[in-house]
Amino acid sequence: MKKNYIALIAGLFLISSCETTGSGSGDAVPTNNYATGESSTANLQVYLQNEVGDRAYFDTDKHNINAAAAFILEAQANWLNSTPGFTIRLEGHCDERGTREYNLALGERRANSVKEFLVSLGVDAGRIETRSFGKERPAAEGSTSEAWAENRRVVTIIGE
């Protein structure tokens, strides 16, 4: 009898923990309204990172936009043009090779290249700030070609 009672309780627990389907109309209501900019800055940043792409990568000692970066930046421009109400900061980064001064200047050139590219696609220049961190904030530690490639980037950060 005790086994039946435990099975009955477990079954009731499973049934009661099932998700309800609502009205059954089939119309899903989004929990975050990314398209109109009504979500928090953190939610927008997560959306940018996961759904659009928040990083453009560069070749060694280069600041020009390559095909892979252009693909990401075109998606960013489309999203930014359809999502008003906030600014972005473009953070330029470099790998560990080179002097601090050289890498700060290269990171700034990279951030400015991304800004010019986004503006050419219709993003309001007044929404964009640039900053260089040079080699001071690596995304990947180590002195390997993979780590260096990961660190040669511009990251788009959502502002207010």
Q: Which ranges hold each PLM region?
A:
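N-terminal hydrophobic targeting signals that begin at the initiator methionine
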Residues: 1-2, 19
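Sec-dependent signal peptide recognition
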Residues: 2-8
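C-terminal motif of bacterial Sec signal peptides marking the signal peptidase cleavage site
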Residues: 14-17
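Periplasmic peptidoglycan-binding/tethering modules of Gram-negative envelope proteins
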Residues: 19-87
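Periplasmic OmpA-like peptidoglycan-binding domain that tethers envelope proteins to the cell wall
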Residues: 93-160
